[in-house]
Amino acid sequence: MKTSEFKTDIFNLFDQKWAVLTADTPDRWNAMTISWGSMGTIWGYPQNGRPIVTVYVDPLRYTYEVLNQSDSFTVSFFPEERRKDLIMMGSRSGRNGDRLKGSGLTPVNNHGFVTYKEAELTFECRKLFQQTLDNVTPHFKVPGYRRYAANWSSEN
């Protein structure tokens, strides 16, 4: 789908839907639920910006390790009736076992990107930039901030 055909309110996707971030390739991948992220454009003139997705991942998460070694990731959004499956994905670590098992989600390889048959919307992203958030302004920092001190921006 072309970005000009996209009719979803991107400002509410992360707030109102549950999402799964999936990193790496179908041979070696891991997924986690996410609720912090944003979408927009960068490096372009009006009508010609590069679409990006930015996600924030706790450095203690196993997906953080996998994402560090990957040049791509997907962000998949699911309908409300899949919330129970996503709770399963968000409650276990991929480091210690298969969190997909028992979730009811079906992974699909889409040209080297892992998505899910049950997803209603998936962004396939190539990593463009990553950094820790150590230098954010003091008013941004909230209790528990240190745990959420990394992010990735990508071109999709």
What feature does the model see in each segment?
Residues 1-156:
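Basic, polyanion-binding surface patches
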